[in-house]
Every structure is written in C-alpha cells, then in structure tokens.
C-alpha cells in the first residue's frame, strides 16, 4: 500500500469511527507532534536512523495508553517487527525457548529491561537474568560453583545481550536507552570471587560472585535463593557497555 493510499483509507474510515476511537487516534497523532530527542551511536550497526525513529514512535504510542514502562514482551515484539520492516532478517525465539529471545541476522540476542524506581544511570541491574533450575543448592560454598556454571552455560547459547532501560518516566517526559552488555565482560564471572551469605535465613542460602579488576568491582552475580530461585546481575558499570541509542520525548498533557 502506498503512502497516499494509506492516507485516503484513514480519511475514508474517520467518519465511521466512534468518538472515543477518534480521541485515541487524535492523541496518538498529537503525541507524534510533541518535542523529541532521538539519538543513536554513529557506530551502531543495529540501530539505523530508520529503526531509531520507528522504535521511538512505538515508545511514544505505548505511553499514549499507559504510564507503565515498556515491558520485555513488548520490547521483543516491537524490535522484531521494526527490524523486519527495515529489511533485516529477524525472528523471535520459539515460545518456551531458554537462552536467547530473538535471532537477528544469524546472531542470537538475549533481551532484558530495567525500569526500577531507584534506577541508577551509570550502573545496570538485571533483576532476573535467568532462572536457576536444578542442581545442588544448600549452604555449601561449593554449591555456588554449579550455579555459576549454569550462568556460563546460558551465555554459551547467546551471542549478544541488549537491555532497554527506562531512565525517566515522569509524565510527560520519558527517557529510554538501549545498552549492549559485552558478553566477554560477563564471562569474567568464571574467575569471580564466590561468597555464600551464611547469615541469611533463606533456604537455600543466597550467594554472590564478585567480579573485580584492579581492586575495582565491575559487577556481581547474585544467586537469589527466594521463591523464584533466580540469578541477578548487580552493579554492572555502564562504562563497560555500549549505548546504541537514546529516546527522550514528551507527551501531550490531558486525558483521553
């Protein structure tokens, strides 16, 4: 369908729409006219100028209908559709697939989001990198070796890691950034310092893997022994990562 054909179809359909549907369309169109500042790294092969604009518009449309941050499932779907529209071969992983979330030009990507109220601009926290399934996990420090190996095995099945971070969500101004976490940095956990939190009342007991370099903490893995039994990545220095793009925008005030 050509651009003119699409415009004519919208014009023809407008008189048949109920008032609230017209309000929805009007708000979305109004959002696209608000101030915005979309930026991409000149070296990013993933976020082209077209992908930058299209993904930013999807974020703006989302916030016309919700105050909540863009969720992981929306991130996955939007990235796939926008890349395909731009001519890139992309496909979401089969439902239930562990490890990667999307394949882009033969590379397997893990997609994460971060949107905590206490988010820190210069350090990254992944509250659930993966679930920690079977294996021995009690109060023995050596149990953490097996849990760390689960993490390293998961990394072996992916090529790249992207995280969409919601840095500002103070309606009407929003700020998102897309950051790539270098896989080699995470692989440094293989020689990290392990510590079991023996004072914890949890069972199994939580533990840490501290990844340090020149007496500086680069990040830590947190083996969360709570109900979900999950692995967190804490305090990852953003300076070790690549910022592919940022999207800052305003939305029209008022309600639908």
Describe every region a protein language model picked out:
Residues 1-100, 104, 112-256:
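Nucleic-acid endonuclease domains
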